[in-house]
Regions:
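N-terminal active-site beta-alpha-beta segment that forms phosphate/nucleotide-binding
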Residues: 2-152
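Conserved phosphate- and dinucleotide-binding cores of soluble alpha/beta proteins
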Residues: 4-5, 9-14, 35, 123-220
């Protein structure tokens, strides 16, 4: 995960400004929005997603480093003991908090780190064990993933958020991978959303398929 690490790499929108959803859906809030309202919610989410990603990409490298370190400290308090547990992390993408050094410390404290891998669009994620020096390849969206390694069921899932609300619903990239994966897992892990405090929104207008995180950890 550190920059000095040697990594083998194999290379195998109704864009509009966010609308006033309280006018589109009068009873807005954290209750589930019914599927027939999806035609209104989907373009709103797309616009909100773009706004939030643009905002976090505008943060400079030093600012992102400071925010990531604060999130890492709060993760330690939230998760507690990691020895003997499998924690699913992620490889940072598009300005997400960089928790790679924190993941290495999890391994040093007796835990195991797994990274999510997209096997095929529309399928649940696979979690592969990763450690420093293990070979990586570019997966979907050009994100680095373990090129091989055992598939495991994590005890803790760290899910980066684009946005989040007070009910712990996560706004992601729109692929539905985390929701699909959590719904398919035989035993629910402890699910921690991580993101910047500025990514908080009033509601994501949750749909029946949206699964809330157990907790959201931010830099504030």
């Amino acid at each position: 995960m550190p920059d000095k690490e040697t990594t083998r790499i194999e290379t195998r929108e109704y864009a509009s400004s966010p609308c006033c959803m309280q006018e589109v859906i009068p009873r807005y809030g954290t209750e589930l929005i019914q599927p027939d309202a999806w035609a209104d919610v989907a373009p709103w989410r797309k616009a909100e997603r773009k706004r939030l990603i643009d905002e976090r990409l505008a943060v400079d490298a030093e600012g992102r480093k400071v925010k990531s370190e604060k999130i890492a400290s709060r993760l330690d308090l939230t998760i507690g003991k990691v020895s003997g547990r499998i924690v699913s992390g992620y490889w940072p993408f598009r300005g997400e908090p960089d928790l790679r050094n924190w993941a290495i410390k999890v391994i040093e404290r007796g835990g195991r780190i797994a990274l999510p891998v997209v096997i095929q669009k529309g399928w649940p994620l696979e979690f592969r064990v990763w450690g420093p020096g293990d070979p990586l390849e570019r997966g979907i969206w050009n994100i680095l993933v373990p090129s091989h390694g055992p598939s495991v069921q994590p005890d803790v899932v760290i899910a980066p958020v684009v946005g989040f609300d007070d009910a712990n619903y996560r706004l992601g990239y729109g692929g539905g991978f985390f929701d699909r994966t959590l719904a398919a897992m035989p035993k629910r892990p402890f699910v921690v959303g991580v993101g910047y405090a500025g990514s908080r929104i009033q509601t994501i207008y949750p749909q029946p398929h949206d699964i809330p995180m157990d907790v959201i950890v931010t830099d504030e």
